[in-house]
């Protein structure tokens, strides 16, 4: 059968041809349809694989970055540790160097302190005392200024309460701590104990015309030693004598023994039995001494010993440079007693040549080659000389360049000083003045010390009469002003000062400070401070410990006050 016969009855030839053609194409389509999902699947698998590769790559990148960060941090930590170790080493090195340097400095300073021999300590104490005095003066000035000024600042401060811390830091108006001697003396008096008799003090029996007191005398068991010590300081300049021309072998003991024996031999001991000399200071380099006597009168009697032979050579007895004749005249005799037996020690009365007194002239700046006759001739051009002394070196006999003289006519003293002072003598310039002129500048201060001592003695005499009885109330007068009491802040400060200072002496039970009346009515006891103690032990210590102190620049006067009047509120007694 032919090819066409197979399709016979099923269609035309065209259909057969069509079937043949399409039959082959359908196979291809089927093949295509079968391969597409496979391709898509393979593509998907490849894409998935690539995605996984990319994810793995990203993970590896992150791991590398993390490892890098960890490594970097580790390196940073190592670097910081290294730097820290370096800093520690540097710090240790600096500290060792500093300690070594400080040790060397300390050793050097310690050696210097040993070489200075304590001079720095003395300078420090003097500086500290000067600072203390300046601070004390400043406190007095501030309190005085506060009492004179009622400024707006004070009014503003008055409205504010004072804090406890501020109160603690406030400086007390009192100038210094209570003297220990007053505390001890008062304590012994209260308990009925008599303090042991002190050694004989120089100058006992001073102020004979005003208040004679033998050494160690007391009133009612109350020691007068603080007053005696004060008078000793005030009279010391008049109780010392200058002794020049000493031998190299002289010492304090030999000088004191010699002059004590000589004073007894001539009848110059006027202060009672015992040695007239209480202290000796020797300058071995310049061969002179200051000899301190017990009394002003004995020092004046010692002036008659000028030229006496001591250890084989004559010595000069003079007044020291700080001697003030006008002030000494109020303390005792300024001239030797005319009844001294000078012949007993080989002296002739008047041998000193009249070189004492306020009209003695000092002549300094003399050329060393000037002889005694040349100097005397120069001075006598103004009048006759009552006494003359050219000071010479003991060993060489050469002039020391200065002299002393006294004119017979005392009226020419100032004329000669004015004419000769400042004259050129070769390469020297003369200095001519009264010998005591340098100390006259100290007269006001010395007189103040003397006046203060006299006032204290007179006050003690009044307060320590046999009828005076200690009470538990102490009244302080001359302490505060009316203006200070009007101001609330000032009043509070004063009250606090009194409580603090008064409490140092005993159990303080009450403090009363009367204040001015707002209506201007008179108030009893204005300007006084009343301290009430639990017993007379505390009041007695306060009485002697606060008397003479300074509060805000005012000198405190402390007296006992009747207990019955205090309890009644009567402060005007």
Swiss-Prot record:
**Function of the molecule:** Necessary for the splicing of pre-mRNA.
- Lineage, broadest ranks: Eukaryota, Viridiplantae, Streptophyta, Embryophyta, Tracheophyta
Matching PANTHER family: RNA-BINDING PROTEIN (PTHR23139)
Q: Where, subcellularly, is it found? A: Nucleus
**Domain RRM spans what residues?**
239-322, 359-437, 478-564
Q: Which UniProt keywords apply?
A: mRNA processing, mRNA splicing, Nucleus, Repeat, RNA-binding, Spliceosome
Instruction: Indicate the principal place this protein occupies in or around the cell.
Output: nucleus
Pfam families xref list: RRM_1
As recorded in Swiss-Prot or TrEMBL, the protein's gene is named: U2AF65A
The reply on keyword Signal is: no
Q: Which portions of the chain have biased composition (kind: Basic residues)? A: 94-105, 159-169
Superkingdom assignment? Eukaryota
Q: Please name the source species.
A: Arabidopsis thaliana (Mouse-ear cress)
Q: Name one GO biological process term.
A: mRNA splicing, via spliceosome
Q: What name does this protein carry?
A: Splicing factor U2af large subunit A
């Amino acid at each position: 059968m032919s090819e066409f016969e197979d399709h016979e009855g099923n269609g035309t030839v065209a259909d057969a041809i069509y079937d043949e053609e399409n039959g082959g194409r359908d196979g291809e389509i089927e093949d295509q349809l079968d391969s597409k999902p496979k391709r898509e699947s393979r593509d998907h698998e490849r894409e998935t694989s690539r995605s996984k590769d990319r994810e793995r790559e990203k993970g590896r990148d992150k791991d590398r970055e993390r490892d890098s960060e960890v490594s970097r941090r580790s390196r940073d930590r190592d670097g910081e540790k290294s730097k820290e170790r370096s800093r520690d080493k540097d710090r240790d090195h600096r500290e060792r160097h500093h300690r070594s340097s400080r040790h060397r400095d300390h050793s050097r300073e310690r050696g210097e302190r040993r070489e200075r021999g304590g001079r720095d300590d003395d300078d420090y104490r003097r500086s500290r005392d000067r600072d203390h005095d300046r601070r004390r003066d400043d406190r007095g000035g501030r309190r005085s200024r506060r009492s004179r000024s009622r400024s707006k600042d004070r009014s503003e401060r008055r409205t504010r309460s004072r804090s406890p811390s501020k109160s603690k830091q406030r400086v007390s108006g009192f100038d210094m701590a209570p003297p220990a001697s007053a505390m001890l003396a008062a304590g012994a008096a209260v308990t009925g104990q008599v303090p042991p008799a002190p050694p004989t003090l120089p100058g006992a029996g001073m102020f004979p015309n005003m208040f004679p007191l033998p050494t160690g005398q007391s009133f009612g068991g109350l020691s007068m030693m603080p007053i005696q010590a004060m008078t000793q300081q005030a009279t010391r300049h008049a109780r010392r004598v200058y002794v020049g021309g000493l031998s190299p072998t002289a010492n304090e003991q030999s000088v004191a023994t010699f002059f004590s024996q000589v004073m007894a031999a001539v009848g110059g001991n006027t202060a009672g039995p015992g040695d007239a000399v209480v202290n000796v200071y020797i300058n071995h380099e310049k061969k002179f001494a200051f000899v301190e006597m017990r009394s002003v009168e004995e020092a004046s009697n010692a002036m008659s010993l000028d030229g006496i032979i001591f250890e084989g050579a004559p010595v000069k007895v003079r007044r020291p440079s700080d001697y003030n004749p006008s002030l000494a005249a109020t303390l005792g005799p300024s001239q030797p007693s005319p009844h001294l037996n000078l012949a007993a020690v080989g002296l002739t009365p008047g041998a000193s040549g009249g070189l004492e007194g306020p009209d003695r002239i000092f002549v300094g700046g003399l050329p060393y080659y000037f002889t005694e006759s040349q100097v005397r001739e120069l001075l006598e051009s103004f009048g006759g000389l009552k006494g003359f002394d050219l000071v010479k070196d003991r060993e060489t006999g050469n002039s020391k360049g200065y002299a002393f003289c006294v004119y017979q006519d005392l009226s020419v003293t100032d004329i000669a000083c004015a004419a000769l002072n400042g004259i050129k003598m070769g390469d020297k310039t003369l200095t001519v003045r009264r010998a005591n002129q340098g100390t006259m500048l100290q007269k006001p201060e010395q007189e103040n010390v003397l006046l203060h001592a006299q006032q204290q003695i007179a006050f003690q005499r009044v307060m320590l009469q046999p009828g005076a009885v200690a009470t538990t109330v102490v009244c302080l007068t001359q302490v505060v002003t009316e203006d200070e009491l009007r101001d609330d802040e000032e009043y509070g400060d004063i009250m606090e000062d009194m409580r603090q200072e008064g409490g140092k002496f005993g159990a303080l039970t009450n403090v009363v400070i009367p204040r001015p009346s707002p209506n201007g009515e008179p108030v009893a006891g204005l300007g006084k401070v009343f301290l009430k103690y639990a017993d007379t032990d505390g009041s007695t210590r306060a009485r002697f410990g606060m008397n003479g102190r300074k509060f805000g620049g005012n000198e405190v006067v402390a007296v006992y006050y009747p207990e019955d009047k205090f309890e009644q509120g009567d402060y005007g007694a």
